Regions:
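Membrane-water interface at transmembrane helix exits
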Residues: 5, 58-62, 110, 139, ...
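Cytoplasmic/organellar membrane-interface segments at the starts of transmembrane helices
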Residues: 79-81, 134-204
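Short, small-residue-biased leader/transition segments that mark boundaries at the very start
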Residues: 1-3
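Membrane-interface helix termini and inter-helical loops of multi-pass transporters
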Residues: 34, 38, 103-111, 183-191
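Divalent metal-coordination and catalytic microenvironments
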Residues: 8, 18, 46, 72, ...
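Helix-coil boundary and interhelical linker segments in multi-pass alpha-helical membrane proteins
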Residues: 24-44, 111-119
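Interfacial and helix-entry/exit segments of alpha-helical transmembrane bundles
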Residues: 14-19, 24, 49-130, 152-171
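Helix-loop interface residues and adjacent transmembrane-helix termini in multi-pass membrane transporters
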Residues: 6, 33, 37, 63-66
Length: 204
């Protein structure tokens, strides 16, 4: 699974992005209204969470000029605000209920099960795997004692960085609590795509 101590944090997020797009493809291929609506919402939510994660990795790279997991450890001691936001964003990425990542994934799984029972079951197991490797990475980077003296002088997020990431964090929370708001924007498109797929199936 390409998970090693010296793995690049940015690559880990990229692998996670591929996983999220797999859910999107499952939802679209199922062709149902609910699964397609979930796929559209998943793409929107993925843009928010992945964008935030890449920003956070960029902030860390500016300070240490490395993205290898083995170069870190215990940095929540010196960067508590950064650690809290990274954990929150990781929870959103793996689909914790109450955050934006849960909405699309749940709709895709529910809408795809009747069409692809086996694939949907595998996808549901993938949610667990995603949680494992994201939390594994968090543990290696942030928890425990500081394992590298270069990390002892790391500065926490400044005002500019905080203001740039907070809007994305608020979106993760808002969409997770009020999913109906974003559903109102995609409901028409989801219906059109679902009807088009059904039409092609009938022609076939």
């Amino acid at each position: 699974m390409c998970i090693r101590d010296r793995i690049d944090i940015k690559k880990l997020i990229a692998y996670s992005s591929v996983s999220h797009m797999g859910y999107v493809m499952l939802g679209i291929s199922a062709g149902g209204y609910l699964s397609i609506e979930g796929a559209i919402i998943q793409m929107i939510n993925h843009g928010i969470t992945a964008g935030a994660l890449f920003m956070l990795v960029g902030f860390l790279y500016e300070r240490r000029h490395t993205r290898n997991i083995s170069s870190f450890g215990g940095i929540k001691i010196t960067m508590p605000r950064y650690a809290a936001i990274f954990l929150f964003t990781s929870f959103a990425s793996i689909g914790l209920p109450g955050l934006n990542g849960f909405v699309g994934e749940f709709m895709i799984l529910m809408g795809s099960f009747n069409s692809y029972k086996v694939l949907t079951s595998i996808a549901a197991f993938g949610v667990v795997l995603a949680a494992i490797y994201m939390l594994w990475a968090y543990q290696r980077i942030f928890t425990g004692p500081i394992s590298n003296e270069k990390n002892e002088s790391l500065k926490d997020l400044d005002i500019r960085e905080t203001l740039s990431i907070v809007p994305l964090v608020l979106l993760m929370l808002f969409i997770g609590i009020y999913p109906s708001y974003i559903e109102s924007f995609v409901i028409q498109e989801a219906g059109f795509i679902s009807e088009t797929i059904a039409l092609f199936k009938d022609i076939k």
